[in-house]
Amino acid sequence: GSGCHSLTLQEAGKEVHAIDISPLSVEVMKQRGVRSVSQTNLFNEQFADEYDTILMLMNGSGIIGKLENLPDFFRKMKLLLRPGGCVLMDSSNLSYLFEEEDGSIVINLAGDYYGEVDFQMQYKNVKGDSFDWLYIDFQTLSIYAAENGFKAELVKEGTHYDYLAKLSRQA
């Protein structure tokens, strides 16, 4: 990202370590004044520090990619979180995209999860590789969290099918 959340937390006196897989994003964060930045993938085995809070904002669930990656995500969070730590993650429920005129929602239950999206970035004539991105509804997130030793709490519901969740390890 651009580091806006990291900068706000830094200015509030918090110790912050930002990561991104994009070398350009890492460079932007450094130029903007984020003091501790690494170019890495959250799922990289070498990324193994411990944290009190892990912020995954701006549809932060996206980097998980697919529902099938959620167990790996929760395993990684168990390694990264200090005792009593939490993940603050936001996402959106894309079910509204499948809403009919009568208000019903028509989703192919035999197909892929409706929140699994294939993204490809483009700026002018430069196209990046496509990548998986996960938008997950809170109920599904809660189920996967419980199955993997975490509790999901709804912190705030947004105005357009979006929400902020807190994920904590269950005792």
Question: Each predicted region: which residue ranges?
Answer:
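Conserved SAM-binding strand-loop segment of SAM-dependent methyltransferases
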Residues: 30-44
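A short acidic, Gly/Pro-enriched loop at the edge of an enzyme's catalytic core
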Residues: 43-54
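SAM-dependent methyltransferase
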Residues: 83-142
